[in-house]
Regions:
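Short amphipathic alpha-helices and their capping/turn segments at secondary-structure boundaries
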Residues: 1-9, 38-47, 164-165
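N-terminal small/glycine-rich loop or linker at the start of catalytic domains
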Residues: 4-30, 90, 114, 144-150, ...
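Conserved, mostly hydrophobic/aromatic
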Residues: 25, 45, 119, 176
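Glycine-rich anion/phosphate-binding loops
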Residues: 30-40, 123-130
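Active-site glycine- and acidic-residue-rich loops that bind
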Residues: 32-35, 149-159, 184-188, 211-214
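Active-site beta->alpha loop and helix N-cap motifs at the rims of alpha/beta catalytic domains
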Residues: 46, 52, 57-166
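Conserved C-terminal portion of the radical SAM core fold
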Residues: 163-181, 203-204
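Catalytic alpha/beta core domains of metabolic enzymes, predominantly
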Residues: 179-214
Length: 214
């Protein structure tokens, strides 16, 4: 992996790009997007050559009232298929599953029954064991899997080191994400953290993703 590193001007075809407009934007409007907007966004991502499109969350309907949120809070299989059909395109479909807020055994079917390609597991530093369990379950179901550790700007150095070691060594996730949840990290901090993540990820044959804020 080290030979693939570059700088801001390097050509990096190995880097994959994910559009999170629906999932992240839905936090602002309670996921009340029209089907027309979602379809247009999907087609724009396909035309632009985007690698992944994240549709929203796999939220537990026992915790969140479906009457209070749009459909992309829950990402039912039939709703995604109404937009993408069989998704006969190079674009891959992603959903996010929050630790403690997703009923994985009820709401995440085997990949053979779903048009979704990737599940991104969102966790905080204090729920790493549950994140490992969810990541391994989703991997066993046939999905590509990431684990995103939220709010790392508030985590201590030692607990972050332990969390990364546990995730990298015990989870079946292919990717571990560096997430700046609050937009509070400066470039030099991101570089230092990225080096930390990459060092541990490479040790266990995993890759690193980043979700930044402006």
């Amino acid at each position: 992996m080290a030979e693939n590193r570059g700088n801001l001007t390097s050509y990096r075809p190995d880097i994959k790009v994910m559009d999170c407009t629906l999932r992240d934007g839905g936090l602002v409007n309670n996921f009340e997007f029209t089907d027309e907007f979602v379809k247009d966004l999907y087609e724009a991502n396909v035309a632009a050559g985007i690698d992944y499109m994240e549709f929203g969350y796999k939220a537990d309907k026992d915790i969140f009232d479906e009457k209070e949120f749009g459909k992309w809070k829950f990402c039912k299989e039939e709703d995604i298929r109404a937009i993408v059909g069989e998704n006969d395109t190079p674009l891959k479909i992603s959903v996010m599953a929050d630790v403690g807020r997703t009923n994985m055994k009820r709401d995440i079917p085997p990949k053979s029954e779903s048009v979704v390609d990737m599940v991104r597991v969102a966790t905080y530093i204090n729920t790493i064991p549950a994140a490992i369990e969810m990541a391994n379950y989703c991997s066993d179901m046939g999905y590509e899997v990431t684990v995103n550790i939220m709010a790392i700007s508030t985590a201590g150095e030692n607990e972050l080191d332990l969390a990364l070691e546990l995730l990298a060594s015990q989870s079946k996730a292919q990717y571990i994400y560096l997430v700046d949840s609050y937009g509070s990290l400066y470039p030099e901090q991101v570089r230092r953290l990225a080096d930390k993540y990459i060092k541990i990820a490479e040790k266990y044959g995993k890759s690193v993703g980043i979700h930044a804020q402006d």
